């Protein structure tokens, strides 16, 4: 039995396996869902049985699998829990300033603590920084230097405004770093936007500490008024009250001005002495005065505006008058220079400036130049301020109040110190043994330089040149064949109606040594021979008169008294706007404008004229001073300026010297083009797409032609400026400079392709045959050959002149023909316009007639249809006509029956009803009533219907 049981058991297991594998009973060919579930359970059961068997046999594998699963679950849980922290947390901030620094460093952004300490100090400077900002790091040393100098008066606080957990980062939203805010007690913040330099920061802080400048004396008043900055003066009496009414408002207005303009363009001063106040027309305490150099100075209108700090600053800023402006580019993208250059020609002065210095001699000279340049009416107040700037002693002032412009000077007020020059009239054939020598003097008016300040009676170059021009126009008046006396004549200048010239002339022979008319005190008596006199006169001719700058250096004291410069801004169409820049900070701009990079003194002056697309520089070898500035401005202001346009170019050292094609720059242009060779110059730029395709052509050309007689060169005109006469309007352009005829340069035809054969033909056609090397075996030409060649040349010249004359006549005839054709074209154009207007009128009338014709056609069709209907109606008998005939016949019968015997009542009753019904009027469009027969038939039909 055990075997059966065993076999049976075995058979049972096999049957289960068979069912699991087959998915159903033996012999079944398809799988059912119940069989699939049983199969899955069988697999799981067998897997668990195998795992338990393996665990019993090798328990260490089970423990390892369990440990590995736990580790995977732990790692997955840890990763998912840290999924939000994808940014590394910021490191805690550290101190930005050292512990020994005078700056209080709140590196954790404690803005509330900064507000707390600000309440205990009168002046506080807050420095907001970001630790990673390079500009903040660079400004750190400057802030420390300024704080060390002002630590006993000002509290400097640095705040880290970048740490994300600090209050500064949460409450302040700055777009740049560093940021400097200044608080003066409860007033602020005043933001500083100037250069991050210690001296400028200290100057700004000191300006905020003392916004008002005390004026105790007349000298201090002149210092205040002669400054280039606009000045506002307030008069307050402190005798009756320690704080007069309006003083605090005036004090706040000075701080308000500094808040609006960190440069402190408008200065504020206080006068407490009533005598000083009267000099500027201030009488009542609390009045405010705005000084202006050239326009009428103003007093604050209390009756029009409220006396508030903002109104005072607004009034001063709207009415201020500036001599020149300080420019401080911040180094980034800015329209500062562009906006100023749009206003007109600009004079840029780069000077080393120390804001903390008490005196600025060079700045005083520039101020003096600006005052004279704009002093158009010779104002006495401006003259007094100029004397103060020159440190010239002057009498005590009576008043600095503005006065009305003086009337034009009379002839008696002409200056008593004319300037003279000796000239010689051109001699003619009849006067070969005599010469007319004249002393030409320019009489100056009071509107120019005062005689008291004139040290040398010498005119400027321009005045003497104008006098010579007017003199030579009237030289026939001064010719005398033989005259022993001195004759003088006065004539007005054509340039100014308020000045005139005096010419005193005398005829002398060649042997005369000197003039004898010393009693006139006009002519000098030089003891020289006429030959030397003639040489000296030739030296003083207009073409040989030294340049104005040379003249000023020859007579330096004359520059102080020149009348040509005073009020020049009102006598020229090229008025300059003057701008100053600190060369210690912005020397890079000066280098880009033409200043040398290795200048021993960083002083530079340049004039930029955007409209004329040119700029001029003052010679760096000349010192920047009043004389040179006046000469520089005068030379620019004349109509035909002697200044040379500054040209910028590439560095010639970067190009190799030994090359087939010579690279030309601005500095080497004249050297290359003026060689004793034929020079072919190509104009190109880097952005010209067609220019590089010509390189192989010019390389082949340079290889074909000999180097000793021909030069192939090129110039990049985008990097190198050239004089106007050598500029071109298209690229590429080829210019040819012949060897011995450099003034006859030729441009390659623009409509001719630039190819090697065309270039060779062009060069051979325009080259100089004389420049080619001659064969030593050929003998020189004979005299007859030279004479015949000269005759041929003269004939050729006469032929060319005749051809030119014919061309001129043809041009004149063509011009007349052109004028006639233009007149005819104009009349034809007028006729065309007139015909066009007539055509438009006719077209409009035609459209009106067409619309009228269409209306008539529609009306015609309508009437035609009506006529057809009438004709149709007249041809067809209408039912109304028949009904009328019956009615007439009936009435006739009734009339006939009235005279006969009476009929029975029913018949008589029926007739009136019938007649009544018959008497009803029917319109032509109505339906005729039915006849009697039809009525009877209708009644019978109804009766039959009712019966049925």
Curated annotation (Swiss-Prot):
Compositionally biased tracts (Polar residues): 915-924
Membrane topology: Single-pass membrane protein
Chain segments annotated as transmembrane: 61-81
Cellular localization per UniProt: Endoplasmic reticulum membrane
Coiled coil region boundaries: 793-874
Span of domain Thioredoxin: 88-214, 618-768
Residue pairs linked by disulfide bridges in the UniProt entry: 438-441, 688-691
Presence of keyword Hydrolase: no
Database matches in CDD domains: PDI_a_EFP1_N (cd03006), PDI_a_PDI_a'_C (cd02995), PDI_b_family (cd02981)
Entry GO CC: endoplasmic reticulum membrane
Domain of life assignment: Eukaryota
Chain residue ranges for the region called Disordered: 1-35, 895-948
Main localisation: endoplasmic reticulum
Pfam families, per the entry: Thioredoxin
PROSITE patterns in UniProt: THIOREDOXIN_2
Keyword terms: Coiled coil, Disulfide bond, Endoplasmic reticulum, Membrane, Phosphoprotein, Redox-active center, Repeat, Transmembrane, Transmembrane helix
Modified residues (Phosphoserine): 798
Gly residues compositional bias, start-end: 1-13
The protein's assembly and partners: Interacts with the cytoplasmic part of DUOX1 and DUOX2. Interacts with TPO and CYBA.
Membership in a protein family: Belongs to the protein disulfide isomerase family.
Cited function: May act as a redox regulator involved in DUOX proteins folding. The interaction with DUOX1 and DUOX2 suggest that it belongs to a multiprotein complex constituting the thyroid H(2)O(2) generating system. It is however not sufficient to assist DUOX1 and DUOX2 in H(2)O(2) generation.
Name recorded for this polypeptide: Thioredoxin domain-containing protein 11
Natural source organism: Mus musculus (Mouse)
């Amino acid at each position: 039995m055990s075997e059966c049981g065993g076999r049976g058991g075995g058979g049972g297991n096999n049957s289960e396996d068979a069912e699991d594998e087959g998915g159903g009973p033996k012999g079944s060919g398809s799988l059912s869902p119940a069989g699939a579930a049983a199969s899955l359970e069988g697999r799981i059961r067998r897997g668990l049985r195998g795992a338990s068997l393996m665990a019993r046999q090798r328990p260490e594998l089970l423990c390892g699998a369990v440990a590995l699963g736990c580790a995977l679950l732990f790692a997955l849980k840890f990763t998912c829990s840290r999924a939000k922290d994808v940014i590394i947390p910021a490191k805690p901030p550290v101190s930005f300033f050292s512990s020994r620094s005078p700056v209080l460093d709140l590196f954790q952004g404690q803005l509330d603590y900064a507000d707390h300490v600000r309440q205990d100090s009168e002046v506080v400077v807050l420095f907001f920084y970001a630790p990673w900002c390079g500009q903040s790091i660079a400004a750190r040393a400057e802030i420390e230097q300024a704080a060390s100098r002002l630590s006993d008066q000002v509290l400097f606080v640095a705040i880290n405004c970048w740490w994300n957990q600090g209050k500064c980062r949460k409450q302040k939203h700055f777009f740049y770093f560093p940021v400097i805010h200044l608080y003066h007690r409860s007033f602020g913040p005043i933001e500083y936007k100037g250069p991050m330099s210690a001296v400028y920061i200290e100057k700004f802080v000191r300006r905020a500490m003392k916004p008002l400048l005390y004026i105790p004396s007349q000298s201090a008043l002149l210092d205040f008024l002669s400054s280039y900055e606009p000045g506002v003066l307030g008069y307050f009496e402190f005798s009756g009250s320690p704080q007069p009414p309006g003083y605090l408002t005036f004090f706040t207005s000075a701080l308000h001005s500094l808040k609006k303009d960190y440069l402190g363009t408008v200065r504020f001063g206080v006068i407490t002495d009533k005598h000083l106040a009267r000099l500027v027309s201030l009488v009542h305490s609390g009045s405010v005065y705005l000084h202006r150099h050239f326009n009428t100075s103003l007093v604050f209108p209390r009756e029009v505006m409220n006396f508030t700090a903002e109104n005072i600053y607004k009034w001063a800023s709207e009415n201020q008058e500036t001599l020149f402006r300080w420019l401080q580019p911040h180094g980034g993208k800015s329209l500062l220079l562009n906006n100023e250059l749009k206003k007109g020609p600009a004079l840029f002065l780069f000077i080393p400036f120390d804001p903390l210095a008490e005196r600025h001699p060079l700045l005083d000279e520039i101020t003096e130049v600006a005052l004279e340049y704009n002093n158009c009416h010779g104002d006495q107040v401006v003259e007094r301020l100029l004397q103060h700037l020159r440190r010239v002693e002057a009498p005590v002032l009576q008043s600095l109040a503005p006065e009305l412009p003086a009337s034009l000077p009379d002839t008696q007020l002409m200056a008593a110190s004319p300037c003279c020059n000796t000239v010689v009239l051109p001699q003619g054939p009849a006067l070969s043994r005599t010469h007319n020598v004249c002393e030409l003097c320019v009489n100056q008016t009071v509107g120019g330089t005062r005689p008291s300040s004139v040290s040398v009676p010498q005119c400027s170059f321009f005045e003497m040149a104008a006098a010579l021009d007017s003199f030579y126009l009237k030289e026939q008046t001064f010719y005398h064949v033989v005259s022993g006396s001195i004759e003088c004549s006065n004539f007005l200048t054509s340039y100014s109606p308020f000045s005139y010239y005096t010419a005193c002339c005398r005829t002398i022979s060649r042997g005369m040594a000197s003039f004898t008319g010393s009693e006139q005190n006009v002519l000098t008596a030089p003891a020289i021979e006429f030959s030397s006199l003639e040489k000296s006169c030739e030296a003083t001719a207009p073409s040989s008169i030294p340049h104005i700058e040379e003249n000023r250096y020859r007579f330096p004291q004359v520059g102080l008294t020149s009348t040509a410069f005073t009020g020049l801004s009102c006598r020229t169409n090229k008025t300059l706007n003057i701008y100053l820049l600190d060369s210690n900070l912005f020397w890079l701009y000066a280098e880009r404008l033409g200043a040398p990079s290795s200048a021993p003194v960083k002083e530079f002056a340049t004039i930029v004229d955007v409209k004329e697309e040119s700029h001029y520089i003052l010679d760096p070898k000349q010192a920047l001073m009043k004389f040179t500035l006046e000469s520089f401005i005068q030379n620019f202001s004349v109509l035909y300026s002697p200044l040379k346009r500054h040209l910028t170019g590439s560095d010639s050292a970067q190009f190799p010297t030994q090359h087939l094609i010579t690279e030309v720059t601005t500095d080497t242009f004249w050297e290359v083009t003026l060689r004793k060779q034929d020079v072919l110059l190509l104009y190109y730029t880097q952005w010209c797409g067609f220019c590089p395709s010509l390189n192989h052509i010019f390389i082949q050309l340079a290889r074909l032609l000999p180097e000793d007689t021909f030069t192939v060169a090129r110039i990049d005109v985008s990097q190198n400026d050239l004089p106007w006469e050598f500029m071109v309007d298209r690229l590429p352009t080829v210019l040819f400079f012949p060897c011995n005829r450099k003034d006859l340069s030729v441009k390659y035809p623009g409509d001719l392709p630039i190819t090697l054969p065309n270039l060779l033909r062009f060069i051979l056609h325009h080259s100089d045959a004389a420049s080619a090397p001659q064969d030593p075996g050929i003998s020189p030409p004979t005299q007859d050959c030279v004479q015949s060649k000269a005759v041929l040349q003269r004939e050729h010249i006469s032929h060319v002149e005749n051809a030119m004359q014919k061309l001129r006549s043809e041009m004149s005839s063509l011009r007349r023909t052109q004028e006639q054709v233009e007149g005819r074209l104009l009349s034809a154009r007028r006729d065309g316009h007139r015909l066009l207007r007539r055509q438009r009128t006719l077209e409009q009338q035609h459209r009106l007639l067409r619309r009228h014709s269409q209306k008539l056609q529609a009306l015609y069709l309508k009437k035609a249809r009506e006529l057809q209907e009438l004709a149709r109606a007249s041809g067809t008998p209408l039912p109304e006509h028949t009904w009328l005939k019956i009615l007439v016949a009936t009435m006739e019968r009734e009339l006939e029956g009235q005279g006969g015997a009476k009929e029975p009542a029913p018949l008589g009753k029926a007739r009136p009803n019938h007649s009544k019904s018959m008497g009803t009027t029917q319109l032509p469009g109505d339906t005729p009533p039915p006849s009697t027969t039809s009525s009877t038939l209708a009644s019978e039909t109804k009766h039959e219907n009712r019966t049925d």
